[in-house]
Structure formats: C-alpha cells, structure tokens
Amino acid sequence: MTTNNSMQGLVNLASPKMGTKILAFSDDFFGEVTRMLNDKDPIFIEDKYDNHGKWMDGWESKRRRDGGNDWAILKLGSAGIISKIEIDTSYFTGNFPPFFSLEGIYSETEPNKDSNWKSLIAKTNLVGDCKNNFELNLKEKFNFVRLQIFPDGGVARIRLFGEVKYNWDRFNNEEIIELSSLKLGGSILAYNNAHYGDVSALLSEGRGKTMGDGWETRRRREPGNDWIIIKLAQKGNIEKIEIDTAHFKGNYPDRASIQAISIDKNITTKDLIESSENWDVILDETKLTADNIHEYEINSNSKAEATHIRLNIYPDGGVSRLRIFGKKLDDK
C-alpha cells in the first residue's frame, strides 16, 4: 500500500496537468524553462548536444557576466496553499545555482513590477545533483510563484505540493461538476500498486496520449484485486461515472467497481484505507473493454453522497482516466 508518494494526498500545483505555465523568465539559453515543469523525473543523456551546447533536462540559463540573477515566474493552473517544495538539481553538478529564493502572490491579474510578492523561502543554499526539499506552514493561497536563482545555472524540476483552493461559488447547486478533477482539487490519497505510468494522470483533463498516461498496476500473481482511493474536490451527490481505458488493450482490467463514503470529520489516511472495503457500493462489479470510454449513470436510489471514492479493478491492469460527476453539496 502506498499513500501518494508520502504527500498525504497533496497535488503538485506546478504540474502542467494542473494547467500551470511559465509566464515570464530572464533567460533559458541552455535549457528551455518549461522543462522544469515536466512531471517525469529528469534524465541524463551523455552524448546529447544541441546548438547551444550540452542538452540538459531542465531549465538552464547562460553564465552571467553582468551581475544580477536569473528568475522565472509560474502561473499556477489552480490557486492553492503550498506545503512542500522540491527544487531538483539532478545532473546539474558544476552548473547548478548555489542559492535560490521563492516568492508567491495571489492576484486576479498578472503581476507587474509594482506587485507585492510574499517571500515563501528566503535566499537559501542549494545542493547540486540533488532533490532539495523544503516545508512551509502557510495558510495563504497563491496563483503566481517566482523562482529566483543566484546568480545563474540549472534547475531540473520545481515541484510545489499543496492543496487546491478553488472558488466553489462559481458553481450553483444544480450544475453537474467533475468532482474528481485534479484542477478543482481532487487528489489521490492511496493505492495498493502503481508500477507503471503516471498515477496522477488518472484525474487529469482530456484523454490519455499514450499507455504511460494513466494508472497501471503490475501483473497480479496472487488472489485479490488492485485499488485506488480518491478524495473528491468537493462533497457532492454522484450522478455519473466515466472509466476510460484509452490505449490499454492487452492490459486493461477485466472488471471494475466503485465504492463511496461521505466523511465530515477528520480521519487519518490509514483509518480511511482500513475502512474502505466496507464503503457503499455505487457501481457494482462490471465488465470493461479495451481502449474505450465506459459511462455509467448512478441510480438515484443509491447512496451516492460522497467525499471519497474507491476504484477497484479486477484483477489488475491500467485505467487512463476516472471521472466522477455530480452536484456539489456543502461549500468549502
């Protein structure tokens, strides 16, 4: 059993899957700045060069000869409270920045030279070829983040783990909403196995681009079945479910079922997992097919009020996307 990479259901707010983009930057001569948002871990290709020099899997600026420092501004796809920060300098050994700082702001418009940025991490040492991790204890939400490196160099990845804070007043109580959406605040709390693919893609927008763009378990050689637990972005009444096996052909699950629960009190992830086998069944065990979108209407007689759901697949395999649709209940 795994609890979402020890992040307790937090999402990477800097992920392109969230809609995060680079708004502006000072320089990316050696390595395109967008590379540092890549969800995949950085790689090193020894003999790969381009017109600017050694190809590096990350953002890398040229050597500064004029003083000052380099920077990049991220526009987060969803505003959120940042709890954990990872500045990954993997494979940057003689060319990593010795210091960095991080600032944030919440603004309905793009920041400018007069914007009042809040310091998240003051100027701090970085270690080369390393995942540099930091924790924050802030309650403010941000939708723009500025990474500054001193004076120049390369950053393989930036990851900002936190909780989406969406303005649910934008929806009325009769609208059908994708309650599981990553961008709205849906998150993966735990799963028993995720050997292949990208588990966070399960709640992402659009259809999977490849077989690697989804949740896939290893081949099960023992009795039982695989499962994953998801916290919905908002408590709601579930009315429709979509299970998409795009690109999974010889390795899609034979069957699937879904259970749900509505929890109003604080509960540990461990207790949640232990109780999940006894949650209400809202989708009985049903056959799946390869490379296909499966849609299910939830019977109004079912107990479909939920804050969390558990997807069971039998016995194993891959699911590209899971979408839970319904009407919101309590506003956050």
Where are these regions (language model features)?
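Structured core elements
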Residues: 229-231, 242, 310
